[in-house]
């Protein structure tokens, strides 16, 4: 009887020691960074690079193995009229595209001289840039950025959207867990997915589609049928707080 009791006491003592140790291990196993970026879109990479330039520790966590989102997944046409609106790393990307296609061996299917010298692929005056590209070229550029900037990208990690998968305190994301069990903590988080997966899992409210005019007391939300061609505003839109008064500010 006494030997059995001794065994039970011993097991209880072991459990009492082991449980706190397990809790401490779980906390210490979390990876902590100044900035945690979820997603692998171009926005994810540029956010990470910008933060690293400021001396911050950064990790990109993404479910994909192929980084770059739509840019490397098939959307190789940049549909924008005013290209001078681009700057920073976005502009650098298009300059890198131009540099890629200056190499003769980049042209496998046709000659460079035969490929749209004007139109959407033309750069702005005095700037070496190219605005259409193959997704494989975009992938090559972004993977080179990954190496050049020393980005830490954790691929193949899906956000655990079950209860407790995202830890929030005082309205701020503290950490999130992936389906593999890894935990990522950060001082700041960036949701660089296209669908807003991290923010939705954190409890941020969202709407699917377009709100009606009544939701926020607006007049131009919802589905508009008037002036539908090109979706342009009618003439006469005034940008100032007080109509016609520049001094009132925008």
Where do the language-model regions lie?
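Conserved N-terminal/central alpha/beta ligand/cofactor-binding core
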Residues: 56, 62-167, 207, 215-217, ...
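Conserved beta-strand-loop-beta-strand element in the redox core of flavoprotein oxidoreductases
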Residues: 164-183
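Bacterial N-terminal signal peptides
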Residues: 8-22
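N-terminal Rossmann-fold NAD(P) dinucleotide-binding loop
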Residues: 44
